[in-house]
Amino acid sequence: MAFAVIRACSRVGRGGLYKRLGGPPRGTRRQRQRPRQGRQGASRSIAEQRSAAPRPPTGPPARYPSPAASARASEARRHPAADLDPPPGEPQAVASRGTPEPRPPPESPGAPPPPGSAPADGAMAAAKPGELMGICSSYQAVMPHFVCLTDEFPQPVRPAKLPKGKGRLRRPRQSRFKTQPVTFDEIQEVEEEGVSPMEEEKAKKSFLQSLECLRRSTQSLSLQREPLGSCKLRNSLDSSDSDSAL
């Protein structure tokens, strides 16, 4: 290790590979302090050191390559054609040599298929259902519109809506008697059957109650109208009095 460091220092020099020497090199003070007799030898040694040391580059400073780029470059030096991905039909040896193998011409639609393609197609057709099932299960969350999902996961059917209007069942007569108008058939039916004394008493009582409610409502309305009329009359009298007083 020490020999390697000494050898590198002798090649590069004390100043370094890319370090510019701005002033005089080190050790000049000691050389100045020496007698004049040794100045000539010192100047010669300095000149030799300057001539031996490599000059720094005058251009822009060199950029150190990234570790990823250096790794790629080393791999490319080891394998010159390693970055060339071989096509699926070509062997690995041809791709490593870098000479592409001549491909066969495209087949015409009417040409008969090669003999080895029929069993391969049959094997692929036999392996398709399982592969499709696996594809459907793996793409269930990614591609919900996939074709297989319609068979495996059918969509729920909406319940049929209840019919409206004429199609609905009519309520019984007792519950709809007060809300819907009575038909002539129902009146005739009641007249034919006759009315029991209990029902007649109930009808009379309900009729009297309705009359009493009507009387009370009219009385309250008349009582409310009287103060309103008096207020209007008073206002008119006040206005007339004020006019007459003027």
Swiss-Prot record:
Keyword Ribosomal protein: no
Residue ranges, compositional bias (Basic residues): 27-37, 161-176
InterPro entries referenced in this protein's UniProt entry, alphabetically: DUF4695
Keywords from the UniProt entry: Cytoplasm, Phosphoprotein
Comp. bias regions, Pro residues: 54-64, 101-117
Protein name in the entry: Uncharacterized protein C11orf96 homolog
Pfam families the record matches: DUF4695
Modification Phosphothreonine, positions: T179
Residue spans crossing the bilayer: none
Subcellular location: Cytoplasm
Region (Disordered) residue spans: 9-125, 155-203
Leader peptide range in chain numbering: none
Location of Phosphoserine modifications: S196, S210, S220
